[in-house]
Swiss-Prot record:
L-arginine binds at G64, V65, G66, V67, Y68, E225, C271, E314. One of its GO terms (molecular function) is creatine kinase activity. ATP binds at residues 122-126, 185, 229, 280-284, 309-314. It comes from Scylla paramamosain (Mud crab). Belongs to the ATP:guanido phosphotransferase family. This is Arginine kinase Scy p 2.0101. One of its GO terms (biological process) is phosphocreatine biosynthetic process. Residues 113-127, 127-155, 204-218 are annotated as: IgE-binding and beta-hexosaminidase release from rat basophilic leukemia (RBL) cells. Keywords: Allergen, ATP-binding, Disulfide bond, Glycoprotein, IgE-binding protein, Kinase, Nucleotide-binding, Transferase. Catalyzes the reversible transfer of high energy ATP gamma-phosphate group to L-arginine. The keyword Glycoprotein applies.
Amino acid sequence: MADAAVIEKLEEGFKKLEAATDCKSLLKKYLTKSVFDQLKGKKTSLGATLLDVIQSGVENLDSGVGVYAPDAEAYTLFAPLFDPIIEDYHKGFKQTDKHPNKDFGDVNQFVNVDPDGKFVISTRVRCGRSMEGYPFNPCLTEAQYKEMESKVSSTLSNLEGELKGTYYPLTGMTKDVQQKLIDDHFLFKEGDRFLQAANACRYWPTGRGIYHNDNKTFLVWCNEEDHLRIISMQMGGDLGQVYRRLVSAVNEIEKRVPFSHHDRLGFLTFCPTNLGTTVRASVHIKLPKLAANREKLEEVAGKYSLQVRGTRGEHTEAEGGVYDISNKRRMGLTEFQAVKEMQDGILELIKIEKEMQ
C-alpha cells in the first residue's frame, strides 16, 4: 500500500491535472477519477507507486503522453491507466490484443534502398531492451546502476568480428574522449525535463556508458533512457546491411543478458511509446521535390505508417530538404514487418521523387 504522503502528493497532482484545461496529454485523457481512485493506493513489489508513473506528466503539462513505467510490474499493476494509453498511442493495438513473438524474419529481404546514393544520406536501426530482474530508471539504486554497467560492459567486450569495439563509461570520462564522442554524435546528454521529472537521471553519470565498434557502425547506450539502446547505422542506404548487423548484435547480447519481456506487450521499455518490437528504423533522406509538396509526402507516409521528422529529430526543421523518416508502428507486428513496411515506404518515396524531377 502506498503511504499517506505519497497519496497526498497524488491527490494534489490529480487536482492540478483536472484544472489544466489546455493540457492535451494522454495521461489527462485517461486518468479519470475512477481510475485514479482505483490505483492511488497501489504499490509494486519494488515499491513503485502511481506517483512514479505520472509525476513527469503532472510537472510537464505539455507532455504528449505523460506516463513512464518505473518497473516491469507497473505495466500490469497500473494497467487500467497504461492499457488505454497504449491503445491510443499504438493505433489499433487493442486491450485484448497480444504482441507477436520476436521475429526478425528473412534478413535477406532487406536491400540497399538507394544504390545510386542520390537520396539517402544515412540509415539507422535501433531497439531498446531492459535487463530482467532490474527496475527501470526511477527505482534503480546506485549499486544496481554499477552492477548493470559491469554486466553490460563485460558482455560487450566479448563481441567479435565487426561488432568488436570499446566501452566508454561516462564516469571519469576525459575531456578528449568526451569531445570525440560528441563529434561522432554518439554521446548522450543527461535527460531532458521530461526524464528529469520522471526521476530517470538519478546518480548521473554512474552506470552510464557508450560502446561502439571500431567502424563506428554499431553503438550501445547503457542506462540512458532504457537499460540498453542497441543501434546499427552507417552512411548511405544499405538497410539490409544495417538490419543484419543489428540482428546479429541483439542475438549475441541476448545469449548473455536476459531481457524483460511481457506476454501481451512484447519487450518492455521505460516509456510506453517504445514497447513491443521497440524497433525504430530510419533514414536521413533528401527529397527536395516532395519537400515542396508536403501534402504528397504526408500522404505516402500515412499509407506506409511512416513518421516524418525534421533533420535533428522531433520538433525540428528539415534542414536543406533533409528529413528523418522512420517506421511509426512498434506494436502488434513483428520486427520484420515493422522494418519491411519502412523499406517499402522509402522505396515508394524515392520512386515518386524521381518521377517529379
